Amino acid sequence: MDDVSKCPFSGGLKGFKNKDWWPNQLDLSVLHQHSNLSDPLGEAFDYAKEFKSLDLDALVKDLHALMTDSQEWWPADFGHYGPLFIRMAWHAAGTYRIGDGRGGAGTGQQRFAPLNSWPDNANLDKARRLLWPIKQKYGQKISWADLFVLTGNVALESMGFKTFGFGGGRADTWEPEQDIYWGPEGKWLADERYSGDRELAGSLAAVQMGLIYVNPEGPNGKPDPAAAARDIRETFARMAMNDEETVALIAGGHTFGKTHGAGDASLVGVEPEGADIAQQGLGWASKYASGKAGDTITSGLEVIWTTTPTKWSNNYFENLFNYEWELTKSPAGAHQWTPKGGAGAGTVPDAHDPSKRHAPSMLTTDIALRVDPAYEKISRRFLEHPDQFADAFARAWFKLTHRDMGPKARYLGPLVPKEELIWQDPVPALDHPVVDDKDVAALKAKILAAGLSVSQLVSTAWASASTFRGSDKRGGANGARIRLAPQKDWAINNPAELSKVLAKLEGIQKEFNGSATGGKKVSLADLIVLAGNAGVEAAAKKAGVEVTVPFAPGRTDASQEQTDVESFAVLEPTHDGFRNYLSGKQWLSGEELLVDKAQLLTLTAPETTVLVGGLRVLGANAAGSKHGVFTTQPEVLSNDFFVNLLDMGIAWTPVDQGEHTFEGRDRKSGAVKWTATRADLIFGSHSQLRALAEVYASSDAKQKFVKDFVAAWTKVMNLDRFELKA
């Protein structure tokens, strides 16, 4: 294109952006991603409805046929695409991490940068192109996100393995997710994420930039199986897997297929996002011989683990323990392992040439399962009990591919397993009539007469509901887990104060349920939210605005037995800008952490703004902190936060070296009038947030402020009410 310089958009596209001029500028774009403006299917599109109309049997049949329909442009190893599709599904799901719930297979992100071009995803572009005719045939009845996972399941089934089940319901997104922090590195395979004694930063799980899990050659390419085991344990734990699940996943996945390192890796071309336009989204074009089939280079490793690479067997463990292993190198120069003394020669088939046979081979991360004492014990048990291995792999694979979907109620289709699994955070089914409008009014009156403050009511409801994460659909008010371990003991929830509030609400619940007729009941989960609503209404009334906060009963109360304490521990907030809470060492600024929390709550910038302003004056700060409480009339739902923040009569100065907290002094008298954190002052400092704050600080904003606060509040209270959105 010769006239690129004449394009009116060229300068805008290539010129400096605000972020280039001001690298530290707070980025709010993550609060507005995945809008209808980027969705070609439109706001009215209902994926669940489309999926329910899908002929799933026909789709599965087509996928089975695809497995052995080898294409000349990318021939199937061993005549079967199953191993390639298992890797595709694994890598789609394997980006999930428990720290913030981000990543995973839930939105089909493997189609977009950076994931479509990660070194660890090399040649998975071919898998997606092989799938395209089937996706094209079934159209919008199956999302790419669901198709990735279902194809992985069918691949396993086609090679003789019985999977645990499949739940559909993953709706595609249409642009890269910008909210996920993949690491600080600016180069592929760098590992600046570590500090101290190999301590992994923040919520990160993978060991290097561009890897899904760990380096198969060992830490930083050093072939040390014991050190690799340490990396494996840390990384898989951060992806919600225990030792048994980890061994099962590694061994189960490596029962099939091979790795690819036929020759010099320097002959492999650039990734899809860096490829020429004529490549049409394909990358890693190789100049080594034919560049495909037996000449394929992907990881640089050339490993075939078993004698039956397209059939489920126990041969992975048989080979792992029947041979003694020595370090060698692949044709591409990568570290791998082969049996000592030439043992096993001729037992493994070649992927493309029937006249060739090989010895089995292993990765450093495979040898780790024999070297690490805990992994070795599990591996030997699986060797001796293949049925236990098959069950463990089936369950771990299901968990891997469904972990980011949230509760079982979100799963769609006839293949959903009936068994309730603890990691799905189950809540009891609703088995009683719920309260009506008359009951709601009576309950709110009792709550307001119970001697609890607006601050207590609002804080408790927020603490319960705001555990929700839009990333993996965990947390939220349903289940009333705020009364259970570990949430009842979290420092941010002020356990002593929380127990008093819950005791009062439990008393009201017991009284109502004991006197209600017709089997009608109110759950504590519902009552906590209703109490928060009552507090908001009372505070609005004090501000001169009559409002009814919408309330949808139907939540139920989970038991401690339904609550995995260790699993829920990762939901404990280390920060919540909405409550002006910050604990320990953080890797982001207070304002960045506020945006991070808002994004997990699926909030927009206007919703974030109005909620912070409202929660401050309602007294919802953790531990009763006065930071950001810019009002002389607390527990009144006024716009005082914005009015006083934008008051030019106040000058702000930091009071600590890290500039986390600030004093606001009267410019004339010099007296301290307010204190604040970065999560407060950002609404006056950041030009976009200040523009929003000005709306709510205006003299005509009283009604709008309350109305918008109630709408955003209700959204948060109902974030985990998936049945309301069905």
Swiss-Prot record:
Transition state stabilizer, annotated site positions: 87
Biological process per Gene Ontology, one example term: hydrogen peroxide catabolic process
One Pfam match: peroxidase
E.C. numbers: 1.11.1.21
Crosslinked positions (Tryptophyl-tyrosyl-methioninium (Trp-Tyr) (with M-239)): 90-213
Catalytic activity entry: H2O2 + AH2 = A + 2 H2O; 2 H2O2 = O2 + 2 H2O
Post-translational modification: Formation of the three residue Trp-Tyr-Met cross-link is important for the catalase, but not the peroxidase activity of the enzyme.
Transmembrane helix is among the record's keywords: no
Cofactor note: Binds 1 heme b (iron(II)-protoporphyrin IX) group per dimer.
Region (Disordered): 338-359
HAMAP family xref list: Catal_peroxid
Family note: Belongs to the peroxidase family. Peroxidase/catalase subfamily.
Subunit structure, as described in the record: Homodimer or homotetramer.
Name of protein: Catalase-peroxidase
Organism listed in the record: Bradyrhizobium sp. (strain ORS 278)
